[in-house]
Structures are given as structure tokens and as C-alpha cells.
Design a protein with these regions (language model features):
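Alpha/beta-hydrolase superfamily serine-hydrolase fold, recognizing
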Residues: 1-245
């Protein structure tokens, strides 16, 4: 945050136009970019939010359940949740509680915070491959580890950790937002729901969804592991930067 503010405040010294500053990142970096944009709003020209994790309230999304079947020994590994427990300063054994959505209390599951990640409201059916998951989308709400919830309640209510739960006024002040998601990514739905929410609030936003893509696909635009999907993703990002900055 301090670095971005310094760049914006010292454009002349740095030889850049502060009106043309963009921020972006992928995965956890996408989360960071979105969080910084929540604070700086339209001081930024645009944000690139690529295969982002944008909420920690619901780990039983359709995308999570669909895609842990694939690449689950690498980028879609359930062990990835340990990164989250480390970030929250929790022992790794709590990761399993998150996977079951047992980290939130029964009352929290019925609160406005879960409305922000309600897939009936924010997840278009066209992105879902598995009809059975869509048909059985409604989750039980009468359970939860109250002790764990009390430990992390502040984190669960913090939009700088979960930008998807930010209030409408804050989200409505965001700059142009380019969101990239991949069909075989277990955090796929976060970016799609973010796009739908911004659209609802009349924020200028574009979603680039690659049904055949996976979480790190943008890392393969060249070299011995070059993939067509990697080339396409990077080309689309370049197009956005050229057209919007």
C-alpha cells in the first residue's frame, strides 16, 4: 500500500503519469490488488484481478467442489488452505475446518456477510459444468465451530481480506476492473461473483473467463512449456493495458 501511494504521490519525480497507474496481481496477488483498490478507489486507472481469491467465508463453492477433482496434487491441492491458516496465525490442523465451512458460526452463516458470497445470487449458471452441484447449491447453516469462529471473527468481517464482502458504496467507487478466471481453478467462482457484483453496481468491469484454463495457465505463454491458453491470456492482458491506460 505504501509503495503504491508513493508512486501516485511522486509521479513527477519518478517520470510517470500518476493518472495512468494500474495495479494487478494473480491468485493471492489478485486479492492484494483488490484490497489496495478498495482503499485507493479511482486514484488508480485500473486494476487487474487475475485468478483471485476474494473471500474466506465459503469453501464449499461450486468451483471448489468441481475442481478439486483435477490437479489436486498440485495447484488445486486441498493443502493450499494451509497458506490461509498460516496467514491467520492458526495451527495447520484448522485447515480441515475451513474445508467443511465449520470455521463460521451458525449465526454468521445467516448474516449479510454470507449474502455477499451467495452463489444463487452472484454465480451465473452458465459457468457451472455440473448440474447436480447447481441443483444442490443450498447449504446447511445450523452448524459451526464457535470457538474457532470467535478466534477469527474479525478476519471474516474484514473486506481487506475478503474484498467480495465490501459494502456497495466502497465497491461502487472502484476503477475499471479486469477480472480473469479459469474453468478448472478451485477459486474460479470468487472472480466471477466479483464481476457480477461490480456489474450490478454499474462499475466498469470486464470478465475474461477461460473455460479450459487452470490456475497458473498465464505462466505458460512461451518457453518449453508454452501453451495456447497461456499465450491467449497474456495477449488479452496486454490488449487491456494498451486500450485502457
Amino acid at each position: 500500500m505504501d509503495v503504491v501511494e508513493y508512486v501516485l504521490d511522486n509521479g513527477k519525480t519518478l517520470g510517470i503519469d500518476p493518472a495512468r497507474v494500474a495495479i494487478g496481481g494473480d491468485s493471492a496477488g489478485g486479492n492484494m490488488a483488490a484490497a489496495i483498490s478498495l482503499r485507493l478507489q479511482k486514484k488508480l486507472a485500473l486494476q487487474l484481478v487475475l485468478v483471485p481469491v476474494l473471500q474466506i467465508q465459503n469453501w464449499q463453492t461450486i468451483g471448489f467442489m468441481e475442481n478439486t477433482l483435477y490437479l489436486n496434487k498440485s495447484i488445486n491441492s486441498l493443502d493450499s488452505i494451509v497458506f490461509l491458516t498460516n496467514y491467520l496465525n492458526l495451527p495447520p490442523e484448522y485447515a480441515y475446518q475451513f474445508l467443511l465451512n465449520n470455521h463460521t458460526s451458525s449465526s454468521f452463516k445467516k448474516s449479510k456477510y454470507l449474502d455477499s458470497v451467495d452463489q444463487r445470487k452472484w454465480m451465473p449458471r452458465k459457468y457451472v459444468r455440473t448440474k447436480e452441484l447447481w441443483d444442490n447449491l443450498d447449504h446447511k447453516k445450523d452448524f459451526g465451530n464457535e470457538e474457532l469462529f470467535r478466534k477469527i471473527e474479525g478476519h471474516l468481517k474484514e473486506p481487506l481480506i475478503s474484498p467480495l464482502i465490501a459494502d456497495d458504496e466502497t465497491l461502487g467507487g472502484l476503477p475499471f476492473t479486469y477480472i480473469m478466471t479459469c474453468g478448472f481453478d478451485f477459486i474460479r467462482d470468487d472472480g466471477i461473483m466479483f464481476h457480477e457484483k461490480l456489474k450490478h453496481l454499474k462499475v466498469d468491469t470486464e470478465l475474461a473467463h477461460y473455460p479450459e484454463g487452470f490456475h497458473n495457465a498465464l505462466m505458460f505463454p512461451h518457453g518449453p512449456l508454452k501453451m495456447d491458453i497461456g499465450v491467449k491470456i497474456v495477449a488479452d492482458i496486454v490488449r487491456i493495458l494498451k486500450n485502457k491506460l
